[in-house]
């Protein structure tokens, strides 16, 4: 048996208004959440080695530096590494701070030896746009700057020492790809390049990581990172690279 229920226009209007009012807070909340800034901070340890050559100024000896992470631990003065990301809708900002202080010895002609110390600080700042490639995958395309400060000192016992304090800025372009492997597992690959004789002759870096979600806003990561720079100016040369595993923890808020 079919039962008919009569509704007056006033009742229908009230019902429609009630349904719209009931739905408005959820829609507004979703829109507000999508437009809100989201941040994440990742302090990490970089078990890096150092390979390259240093000539602090024209006429100074060129010293080759080649140290593994275990070698660096013996002479490491200090190190600090942290990465941060901010997102709002499809826009993304990223910053990465890296500091490492190392030293080494090298043989010179005539039976002499030289001591080399390098203090390298870099700050990479980029901004760009995020694209969703699939429900599990997204890519950030960004551009920005890498600021360098490199302090180098070469000393020859009984002869003398030479110092160099070099600061410069490199333009960089960057890409970051993320893929969700499983509900709590993801992988991340990042690469950038720049310099192109604006600051340094050339600089580039790449790193990849596998990430595990421990809690809603906490992730742990393991991966590998390589960073390289080749700077030459008026006889001065700073050409070195750093490579090694990374271990970090990410906090989202």
Positions of predicted regions on the chain:
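Residues that define the transmembrane beta-barrel architecture of outer-membrane proteins
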Residues: 35-37, 76-80, 119-123, 137, ...
């Amino acid at each position: 048996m079919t039962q008919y229920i009569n509704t007056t226009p006033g009742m229908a209007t009230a019902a429609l208004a009630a349904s719209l009012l009931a739905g408005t807070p959820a829609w507004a909340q979703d829109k507000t959440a999508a437009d809100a800034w989201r941040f994440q901070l990742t302090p990490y340890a970089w078990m890096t080695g150092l390979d390259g050559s240093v000539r602090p100024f024209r006429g100074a000896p060129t010293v080759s530096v080649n140290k593994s992470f275990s070698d660096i631990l013996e002479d490491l003065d200090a190190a600090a590494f942290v990465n941060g990301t901010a997102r709002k809708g499809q826009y993304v900002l990223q910053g990465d701070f890296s500091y490492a202080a190392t030293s080494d010895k090298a043989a010179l002609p005539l039976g002499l030896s030289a001591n080399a110390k390098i203090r390298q600080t870099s700050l990479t700042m980029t901004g760009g746009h995020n694209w969703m490639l699939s429900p599990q995958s997204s890519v950030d395309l960004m551009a920005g700057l890498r600021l360098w400060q490199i302090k180098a000192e070469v000393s020859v016992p009984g002869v003398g020492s030479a110092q160099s304090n070099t600061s410069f800025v490199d333009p960089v372009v960057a890409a970051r790809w993320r893929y969700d492997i499983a509900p709590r597992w993801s992988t991340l690959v990042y690469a950038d390049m720049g310099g192109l004789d604006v600051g340094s002759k050339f600089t580039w870096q790449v790193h990849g990581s596998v990430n595990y979600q421990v809690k809603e806003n906490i992730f742990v990561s393991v991966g590998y990172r390589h960073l390289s720079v080749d700077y030459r100016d008026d006889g001065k040369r700073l050409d070195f690279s750093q490579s090694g595993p990374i271990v970090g923890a990410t906090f989202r808020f």
